[in-house]
Amino acid sequence: MTTQLRVVHLLPLLLACFVQTSPKQEKMKMDCHKDEKGTIYDYEAIALNKNEYVSFKQYVGKHILFVNVATYCGLTAQYPELNALQEELKPYGLVVLGFPCNQFGKQEPGDNKEILPGLKYVRPGGGFVPSFQLFEKGDVNGEKEQKVFSFLKHSCPHPSEILGTFKSISWDPVKVHDIRWNFEKFLVGPDGIPVMRWSHRATVSSVKTDILAYLKQFKTK
């Protein structure tokens, strides 16, 4: 058998192997349920280092981006990008809210007082200070998850069908719409109703594009 014929015969096997080993394309964004009862104005959280509750009612009329954050994560580089996103879209009424969490890779290990110094001197470092509101560290999944995240997750299906490995899951109970990793994002409209949700794999740039498209549609209503 000639070399050319061998290649012809092997090609289908090589292609089959490629198809089987290629990772499935994950969705990055999912629209939220439109008939969900309640709004984020029913909830509140404790502001970081202030020991006072902030009612989300104060954001009535704003577009709010909820983000679960961590200081020692590979995605911590998104912090400056989130600063820039809020600054650029502030004229449109966008507000970013950050919620430190230690449930994913234990990448927010310190207490609340250590979060801002960690951001300033370690990651992203270089004197970085977040310009958006941060809240006290807490859970976003499991028995002790913050109630606002229970509402957000119930309102918005997760974009990905992949929950993760048992090794990576440290909370209980585990639910299908649980947050998978640091820096997932939820957009809430000016009426307090969740609009869309992004996987942690979505870049801030792609999130910005989606928000701008949403704002354009919003103006035409």
Curated annotation (Swiss-Prot):
One of its GO terms (cellular component) is extracellular region. It comes from the Eukaryota. The active site is at C73. Epididymis. It catalyses: 2 glutathione + H2O2 = glutathione disulfide + 2 H2O. Its EC number is 1.11.1.9. Pfam families: GSHPx. GO terms for biological process: cellular response to oxidative stress; lipid metabolic process. It is an enzyme of class 1 (oxidoreductase). One of its GO terms (molecular function) is glutathione peroxidase activity. It is found in: Secreted. Protects cells and enzymes from oxidative damage, by catalyzing the reduction of hydrogen peroxide, lipid peroxides and organic hydroperoxide, by glutathione. May constitute a glutathione peroxidase-like protective system against peroxide damage in sperm membrane lipids. PANTHER family: EPIDIDYMAL SECRETORY GLUTATHIONE PEROXIDASE, GLUTATHIONE PEROXIDASE. This is Epididymal secretory glutathione peroxidase. The lineage of its organism: Eukaryota, Metazoa, Chordata, Craniata, Vertebrata. The gene is GPX5.
